[in-house]
């Protein structure tokens, strides 16, 4: 290989005489025997502060699609394929993570083998990733940690690229479309905190609780856990048939043992998925979800931090990283005890979700008693909530504002034909397509099943023009939010008894609120004093509870009815419209997921 190109001396070999990774100072030209490609300017991390990676799950998917296509291309079949990157330490770390993830997912390499290949030759070390806080980095997350997180997620079935929909992932992670991501399929969804009313505030789109109802019900979300101060009435969720819990602790801080214990108890006794939010849905939310995954799936602190950031970039911040490191041993012991007790129980007692914990301070009765119990014994005392209110702009506010300033992507690089989306099989965490039919009664918590498709092959990446529906994604943030505002009845699912095989666009009713969008909106100010989150020291927790916040006077105590009037300007999360490909589009990812996908680990 060195004889063919002196530049490839020291390149990392992943497939002998076939796939290589190299760090080069200059952009090389492909030759008759070598094909070069780079993704440094194509797959770019959207940072909050000094954070620069790892790249999210959709970008990992797109990279794997791209590389699989090259490896299966007839025109490149006799060439060595070289993924090259620059000496920019941040881009280089992300590029190494991508090809390492490919090696773990498709080449059946262990994380250690993939990382060893990355270190071979004359390659310098890789810059470790950091958190999204303002201030000095106090916790290093290495490329190896991220590969180990990918491996654990694959082992436990947390993702499956045969059924993954990158368009839906990228659609719903946008702040104007809900700002949420699945962390554990069918179990945990992390999202930004709802607001009393759907509106745009300082350029940031805010969504009322009712905007999430159709999606939550469709995806079997039965429980909401709020970790921030109360800015909406929990009654709006409970009246719609959801369970709702309040486990407040200060923005940017770490939870007390009591809060962790009660969060785990709630999750272990909940049937269905749990939607967890704080203010931005990043720090506090990621920390508690991480505790559950460490206990029940035996992730290390580094593995779960890596996995959650791959699913939802910016999660787990500052002292929360060190908190998880400190809690790892005790959570593993708790998990071992939990599984031991479960193993010794008679099989007739049911699954994990039906096991009743012995905590004396938890009520598992009706909705009202649950709310009263959690509030009575909660950590969310007046002093802590008042402190968060007095601080005015908190870490969560800043992170949400920064995320809202991101420009919408022009057109997704992986489009799907509408025919391919008919009855497309999805993993448990996959999202749904809305139809124009009204939804059944909002009180039922049963969800219709997703149709299965004989085709599980991935779709060809397309750089071409998309259909008019997909072109909606190229509009400005105001146009996108305007198109998603309308009557709550719009865009809900078909009744379970009516099965449809065609994809229909959701009908959105125009609202007078769109006239506001056409005017000038204030850009989020960035002249606020920065919070050095890494210098935060935990304060002692109080056992007193709080029943309201300083913003309570502005809350709507009654839920918005289904037949919402246009002037109420209620937001509903719209679907992402698939693009189109020609009928001759190539399917190139068949049989690409190795047998590792079925290797579930039982502890």
From Swiss-Prot:
Organism equals Mus musculus (Mouse)
Phosphoserine is found on 484, 592
> Does Nucleotidyltransferase count among this protein's keywords?
no
Question: Lineage of the source organism?
Answer: Eukaryota, Metazoa, Chordata, Craniata, Vertebrata
Subcellular compartments: Nucleus; Cytoplasm, Cytoskeleton, Microtubule organizing center, Centrosome; Cytoplasm, Cytoskeleton, Spindle; Cell projection, Kinocilium
Q: Where is the composition biased (Polar residues)?
A: 518-538
Name this protein carries in UniProt: Dual specificity protein phosphatase CDC14A
| Gene3D superfamilies found in the cross-reference section | Protein tyrosine phosphatase superfamily (3.90.190.10)
Assigned protein family: Belongs to the protein-tyrosine phosphatase family. Non-receptor class CDC14 subfamily.
Q: Which keywords, in A-to-Z order, does the entry hold?
A: Cell cycle, Cell division, Cell projection, Cytoplasm, Cytoskeleton, Hearing, Hydrolase, Nucleus, Phosphoprotein, Protein phosphatase
Q: Where is this region: B?
A: 177-343
Q: Which residues lie within the region annotated A?
A: 7-162
Q: What does this protein do?
A: Dual-specificity phosphatase. Required for centrosome separation and productive cytokinesis during cell division. Dephosphorylates SIRT2 around early anaphase. May dephosphorylate the APC subunit FZR1/CDH1, thereby promoting APC-FZR1 dependent degradation of mitotic cyclins and subsequent exit from mitosis. Required for normal hearing.
Point to the regions of Low complexity compositional bias.
Answer: 539-558, 573-583
Q: CDD domains under this entry?
A: CDC14_C, CDC14_N
């Amino acid at each position: 290989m060195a004889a063919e190109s002196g530049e490839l001396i020291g390149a990392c070999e992943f497939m002998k005489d076939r796939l290589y990774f190299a760090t080069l100072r200059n952009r090389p030209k492909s030759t008759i025997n070598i094909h070069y490609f780079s993704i440094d300017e194509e797959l770019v991390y959207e940072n909050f502060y000094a954070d620069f990676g790892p790249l999210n799950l959709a970008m990992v998917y797109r990279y794997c699609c791209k590389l699989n296509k090259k490896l299966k291309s007839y025109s490149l079949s006799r060439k060595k394929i070289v993924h090259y990157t620059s000496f920019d330490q941040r881009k280089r770390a992300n590029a190494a993570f991508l090809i390492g993830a490919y090696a773990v997912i498709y080449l059946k390499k262990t994380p250690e083998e993939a990382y060893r290949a990355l270190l071979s030759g004359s390659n310098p070390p890789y810059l470790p990733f950091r958190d999204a806080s303002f201030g000095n980095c106090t916790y290093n997350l290495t490329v190896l940690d991220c590969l180990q997180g990918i491996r654990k997620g694959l082992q436990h079935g947390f993702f499956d690229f045969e059924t993954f929909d990158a368009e839906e992932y990228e659609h719903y992670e946008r702040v104007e479309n809900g700002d949420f991501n699945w962390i554990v399929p069918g179990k945990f969804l992390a999202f930004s905190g709802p607001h009393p009313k759907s509106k745009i505030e300082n350029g940031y789109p805010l969504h009322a609780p009712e905007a999430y109802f159709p999606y939550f019900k469709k995806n079997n979300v039965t429980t909401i856990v709020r970790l921030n101060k109360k800015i909406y009435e929990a009654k709006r969720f409970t009246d719609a048939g959801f369970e709702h819990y309040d486990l407040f602790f200060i923005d940017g801080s770490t939870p007390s043992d009591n809060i962790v214990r009660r969060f785990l108890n709630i999750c272990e006794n909940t049937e269905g998925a749990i939607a967890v939010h704080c203010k931005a849905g990043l720090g506090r939310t990621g920390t508690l979800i991480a505790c559950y995954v460490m206990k029940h799936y035996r992730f290390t602190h580094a593995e779960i931090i890596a996995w959650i950031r791959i699913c939802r970039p910016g999660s787990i911040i500052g002292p929360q990283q060190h908190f998880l490191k400190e809690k790892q041993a005790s959570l593993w012991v708790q998990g071992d005890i939990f599984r031991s007790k479960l193993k010794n129980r008679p099989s007739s007692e049911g699954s994990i979700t039906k096991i009743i914990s012995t905590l004396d301070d938890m009520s598992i009765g009706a909705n009202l008693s649950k709310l009263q119990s959690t509030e009575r014994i909660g950590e969310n005392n007046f002093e802590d909530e008042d402190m968060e209110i007095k601080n005015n702009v908190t870490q969560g506010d800043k992170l949400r504002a920064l995320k809202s300033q991101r420009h919408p992507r022009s057109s997704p690089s992986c489009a799907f034909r509408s025919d391919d989306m008919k009855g497309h099989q999805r993993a448990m965490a996959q999202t749904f397509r809305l139809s124009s039919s009204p939804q059944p009664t909002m009180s039922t918590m049963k969800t219709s099943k997703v149709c299965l498709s004989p085709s599980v092959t991935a779709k060809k990446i397309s750089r071409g023009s998309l259909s008019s529906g997909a072109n909606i994604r190229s509009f400005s943030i105001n146009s996108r939010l305007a198109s998603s505002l309308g009557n709550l009845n719009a865009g809900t699912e078909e009744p379970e008894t009516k099965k449809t095989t065609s994809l229909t666009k959701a009908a959105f009713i125009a609202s007078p609120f769109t006239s506001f969008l056409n005017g000038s909106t204030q850009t989020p100010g960035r002249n606020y004093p920065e919070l050095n989150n890494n210098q935060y020291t935990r304060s002692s927790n109080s056992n007193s509870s709080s029943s309201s916040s300083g913003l309570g006077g502005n809350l709507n105590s009654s839920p918005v009815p289904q037949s919402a009037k246009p002037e109420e300007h209620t937001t509903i999360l719209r679907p992402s419209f698939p693009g189109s490909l020609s009928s001759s589009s190539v399917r190139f990812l068949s049989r690409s997921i190795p047998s590792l996908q079925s290797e579930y680990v039982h502890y």
